[in-house]
Every structure is written in C-alpha cells, then in structure tokens.
C-alpha cells in the first residue's frame, strides 16, 4: 500500500448498507503488481478444505485506468490486517481483472502472478458484473462476467502459510470504488443467502475487520 503511513486515514473506505458492501480505495493506495500487492479486503475465514461457492454482483462506481487497479472476489492463503510488508502477501485466486481489463481472472501461485485467459469482455465505471468463485478439493473455478470460465492452472492449495484457514471475500486495489450486492455464500453444500445464515457470517467478518 506504500508503507505504514499509507494504511490509515481516509484513503480506504468500507460501508455496509443492508446486504450491500461498498469498498473504496483512493490516492493511488494499493496495487496488484508483479512482486507485491496492496489491497483492501472484506472477508470471512473458512477452515482449509471447505468446499464453497461465493457469488455477487459488482457495480463499478469508479475505476481508474491503471494496470495495477483491480476489484472482485478473492480467496487467499493468509490475511494481513493494517500491515505493510515488502514481501508478497501469500498465494491467492481472484475473480477480477488487471492490466486495464486485459486479464480474465488471475492469482498468485508460489509468490508469482498467474494470469487466466485474455478477457474478451471489459467492464468499467457504470457497469455491473456478475462474479462467481468456486473452491473444491480439485481447485478453483472463476467466472468474471461474460468472459469464459477460468479454471486451468488454478488448482493449487492456499495453505502454504496458514494451513488451517483460507480467507474468502471481496477486494479492491488502487483507485477503485465498487458496491457488491446479491451476495450468496454456500459452504459444503449448505446454502446461506441474504437471510440469517449469511448475516451471521458477515457479522463475524465485521468483528474481524472493523470499519
């Protein structure tokens, strides 16, 4: 994110309105880059090995034209809260894009960025995009809007650093403001939608990551 002095302040914002979550990053904070990442994430912690499906609609309120800007769904190996480090912050998979919409989903595998196929459909400010992330014992399936489903190469485990848990949720990086709505989470075949089940899950998330 640019150093410890860049973590706090008003450059990172998060609001919850009913079942909608709006995340925003301004002033060039955070990035998706070849050797290191900086991002804001609203997440829930799941036991490693949990089968899950997370879906949401992402409404892009604003999105800068920069190769390091990104937003979407993410599952990752480790979570660092209000922390600035110089090393890559664990492996992950992301239902999102980078390089100004050129990439259809990506991840970080063994510390290296891994890109899915080229995107054929790009999204920007004013657009709403359907996002879907599926995690099973065989790997991950990623769906970013009307682009082709990405799964090849996303079969690595997210347990190299934290072998007990994975961290699943929504993220934004570098000059993006996005509202996530119609959120649905399924774990081990037990459906939790906008009712009490999901509310309990995200209340737990709010305790882990207060605003």
Residue ranges and their predicted role:
Residues 1-211:
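Extracellular glycan-recognition regions
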């Amino acid at each position: 994110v640019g150093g410890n002095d860049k973590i706090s302040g008003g450059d990172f914002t998060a609001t919850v309105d009913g079942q909608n979550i709006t995340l925003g990053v301004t002033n060039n904070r955070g990035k998706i880059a070849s050797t290191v990442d900086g991002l804001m994430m609203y997440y829930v912690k799941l036991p490693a090995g949990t089968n899950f499906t997370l879906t949401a609609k992402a409404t892009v309120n604003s999105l800068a034209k920069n190769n390091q800007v990104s937003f979407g769904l993410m599952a990752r190996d480790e979570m660092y809260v209000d922390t600035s480090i110089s090393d890559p912050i664990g492996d992950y998979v992301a239902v999102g894009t980078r390089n100004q919409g050129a990439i259809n989903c990506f991840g970080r595998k063994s510390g290296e960025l891994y890109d899915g196929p080229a995107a054929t459909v790009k999204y920007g400010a004013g657009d709403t995009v359907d996002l879907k992330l599926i995690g099973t014992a065989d790997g991950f399936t990623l769906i970013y809007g009307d682009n082709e489903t990405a799964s090849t190469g996303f079969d690595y485990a997210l347990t190299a650093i934290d072998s007990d848990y994975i961290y699943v949720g929504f993220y934004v990086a570098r000059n993006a403001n996005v509202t996530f709505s119609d959120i649905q989470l399924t774990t081990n075949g037990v459906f939790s939608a906008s009712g009490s089940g999901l509310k309990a899950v995200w209340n737990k998330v709010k305790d882990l990551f207060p605003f």
